[in-house]
Amino acid sequence: MKLSLAAALLGALAVSAQTSTECNPLKQKCPADPALAGSADFGLTSESPRFHATGGTPTYGNDGASLTIGKRFDAPKLTSDFYIMFGYVEWEIKAAPGKGIVSSAVLLSDCLDEIDWEFLGGDPNQVQSNFFGKGDTTTYDRVKFHPAPNNNQEFHKYAVDWTADKTTFYIDGQNVRELTPDAAKGQYPQTPMRVLAGSWAGGDPSNNQGTIEWAGGETDFSKVPFTMFVKSIKVTDYSTGKEYVYKDMTGKWESIQAVDGQVNKSGKPGSGPKVESSTLPSSPSTSAHVPVHTVPGGGIGNPQAPNTGSSPSNTLTNGPSSTMTSLVGLPSSWIVTETGTGGVVTPTSAAESTSHHSDYTSRSSRSVSSSVSASSGNGGHGMTTSTGSGSAPTGTGSLPGSGSGSAPGYPVPTGTNGGGSNNPTDGGASPTSPAMQAPGSTGAIHSVSNALLLSFCAIAAWALV
């Protein structure tokens, strides 16, 4: 697969727009992460209370959870209500077909450590593996490609064995990639992770051309439905205790405390006490983490559904302190809000209520909000949404470039296909790269807001004359 530089850069941005965090413990004090603290086999032939659905309504049957894109802007996703601190996760998946359709299986932490499997519907014979540390997107040599024949016609098992010393990727039990902290060059994922799976349309015609090209081409929505099946998810948490707490803001695994337990550097899949898949966390502090919504960054996404086809305004407001604007170069209908540090988050569905808005999309220090979803509560975490559409945004900033809101100086992706060999060397290599953050967005927002206010006043004064 060969991509232009624009496709690589904007495609990377599109993928990063899918992962986010509600409260980043490297920047502020956050609630504890409820632990699985054992092993569980989640057969998804029926709904599991331990996985929360957003961006669409899954159905359940013999093939497991059906995550269906039935219309434009659907982006169904399952997110666990628990975390693991080193462990093993195996997703049994049949990826969604369709040009431009992206299926993902992801581990994601509150501080944006991330481990991904990603499938492109237009390329049913390979899968991509990827990783990120603390949301760092300064290099584009982390992804690898692996043979995965007929992945949208047949079920296969995609697993990650994540320890302090090594992360191993498996396809149907075969080791296809190993990642060590040294190979990760300081970006090794090492903080408590949630488990996710979902799909979205990277080929939506309102997205940037680079995003569409990365996803494999423009999606033809006359061919819906596009369905990803998740038959089961097996999870082992190698550590113990009722919850995980960040003792400081270093993001090192040694700084993670297991309350009433211990952090174990490694373990064995299936080990530890068996956790009933229907059992909800009982720790008093977990209520702040039960997903009241949420997505994609680097991995799974949630460019979730707008409910109108109208064009969004360039600058929107929702509440007294959440001015939002779009940035040139962002995928369509993603805008930036000043109530945070800036970055990329995907839209949330207008159909989702307040009780569905704090899990994956809103769990973000990349405080970006969508212009396409209805206003909803945000649990006090600075994430805002308002009604709009999926058309391509305009605004300040450029990609790449300089100035407020721009994403300057991104390197050209280099490297080769990781292939599917056993024990491949790591570091990743690919022209595609999830997760590109848009820095400096807060200043851009203030500039745009002030400029619009001055313009409005000037027009009003002129009219009076």
From Swiss-Prot:
Keywords: Cell wall, Cell wall biogenesis/degradation, Disulfide bond, Glycoprotein, Glycosidase, Glycosyltransferase, GPI-anchor, Hydrolase, Lipoprotein, Membrane, Secreted, Signal, Transferase, Virulence. Glycans are attached at N264. Residues 304-325 have a biased composition (Polar residues). A lipid is attached at S441 (GPI-anchor amidated serine). One of its GO terms (biological process) is fungal-type cell wall organization. Residues 22-223 form the GH16 domain. One of its GO terms (cellular component) is fungal-type cell wall. CDD domains: GH16_fungal_CRH1_transglycosylase. Chitin binds at E118, W200, T211. It catalyses: Random endo-hydrolysis of N-acetyl-beta-D-glucosaminide (1->4)-beta-linkages in chitin and chitodextrins. Pfam families: Glyco_hydro_16. GO terms for molecular function: glycosyltransferase activity; hydrolase activity, hydrolyzing O-glycosyl compounds. Belongs to the glycosyl hydrolase 16 family. CRH1 subfamily. This is Crh-like protein ARB_05253. It comes from Arthroderma benhamiae (strain ATCC MYA-4681 / CBS 112371) (Trichophyton mentagrophytes).
